[in-house]
Amino acid sequence: MNVLAAAMRDAMTRSPHALVVLDKDSDTWRSCPWPEVHGMAESIAARLLQRDRLGAVGLVGEPTAELIAAIQGAWLAGVAVSLLPRPRRGADPSEWAHSTLRRFGGIGVDTVLSHGGVLRTLAAADSTVSICDLTQAARTPTSTGLEYQDDSGVAILQGTAGSTGNPRTAVLSPAAVLSNMRGLIERLRLDGASDRACSWLPLYHDMGLAFLLTSVLSGMPLWQAPTGAFSAAPLRWAEWLSDSQATFTAGPNFGYSMIGRYSGRVRDVDLGALRIAINGGEPVDCEGFQRFATAMAPFGFRAAAATPAYGMAEATCAVTMPFCGEGLQIDERTESGVRQRYALLGRPIAGMQLRIAATDQPSAEGVGEVEIRGSSMMTGYLGDTTGRSDGDWFPTGDIGYLVDGALVICGRSKEVITVAGRNIFPTEIEQVAAQVDGVRHGGVVAVGSKSGAAQSRLLIAAEFVGADRNVTRSAVIKRVISVCGVTPADVVLMPPGSLPRTSSGKLRRLEVRRQLLG
């Protein structure tokens, strides 16, 4: 048994607490004690070990107790696990099934476990990948002589975001995953005896999976809601935090911004127990996060709980994290007469290191590409024959700088927009444009043209939800000029949901640029 599976087994079997899952159909919470979840994991491992040939295991479906147990079940069986998203609303079921099974097959998955309607959709597709009923597997009889399998060297095949290019698969070892989880537990001072976790994050995303595993390894109770339940009604997140009296939660900037923006609709919630609210997975909007903290203060939310962080799938998840109680700290810089505010994202967790390296692009003093290394790093990308050594520095593609050892991220190097010699990061423009009436929140992309640096033009694409396109377009241009000090060459308004996104919801800026420029 690998070190991660052993640590998971010890935590689950010894915990007096439970996994509590929201059933989206009945809208009720269902509790399953952690020892019972591990019992299902052993059953799933027994089912997997009955197969003549066993490669990596794929998981697709709502986050039921059985699906969560299957993650540990794969590790007990000595194989890696990979999770992929359910079909999006409006997707053709057959096309989704074939695409998903091709993706699984391409990374070495030969057995997929699923349940419900997704199981039936996958089973109807023609594929060499074996499709198994997750619910039945969780009920497989086990003998006291179940033999845990040796470490395969791979725990997770984790898809990367692909927001600036084609998604790749990071190969994560059991030791790397365990190191990352322990680093988080140490930094956040998580205690299974007193902490309670609540999440709606997708488990196929590195932040959602890391949140789950950190909660399990600390031995705390976890309330897990399907991502679709949040998407349908984002303000329910506040209700779930109140109902669970959670002390620990996490979400992308978008989630906090939605609650802050529509806080007038929040009623009768108690957020007084919450001591850690991680904001990660996408650039932190300081104004939006502050708006959330201020709006939720009457409901007991403490500003010290705001925890902006930095991470990536290639490092399992977390790279930097503030210490408990630091709250949202902001660094202000003035460049070309324009003031910018950036969140401090904390220092590296135990086992991780970072440095700022020089880039080819002109930049302010101390600003450069973030490079990382450490015990949480991936073994490499699947199929990459070049490999990497443990001590190698990994270039993240993110541009940032340090403030007293705390990391600040400005943006992605591939996405920098250069206008008249000035470097502009897309989020600076997007966060300002998103505040205009008629623009869908979280539906703005700023890109530069393909021209040379001196002649580059700023282009903005925004999803339109207003009444008058001309009024909204003019308002976006005026606000960007006023706040950012740059004039957009064009503002393209698009139907809601039309901007391309990754499976985790991140906007694909480079694809938007290709569309706008033909």
Which stretches of residues belong to each language-model region?
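Adenylate-forming
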Residues: 117-120, 229, 246-293, 306-315, ...
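Conserved AMP-binding A3 loop
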Residues: 31-35, 148, 155-182
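N-lobe entry segment of adenylate-forming
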Residues: 1-51, 71-72
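AMP-binding/adenylate-forming catalytic core of the ANL superfamily
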Residues: 249, 374, 379-380, 399-484, ...
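AMP-binding/adenylate-forming catalytic domain of the ANL superfamily
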Residues: 482-506
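Conserved AMP-binding/adenylate-forming
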Residues: 30, 46-88, 194-202, 277, 284-406, 413-416, 423
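Conserved AMP-binding/adenylation subdomain of ANL enzymes
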Residues: 178-196, 206-247, 262-263
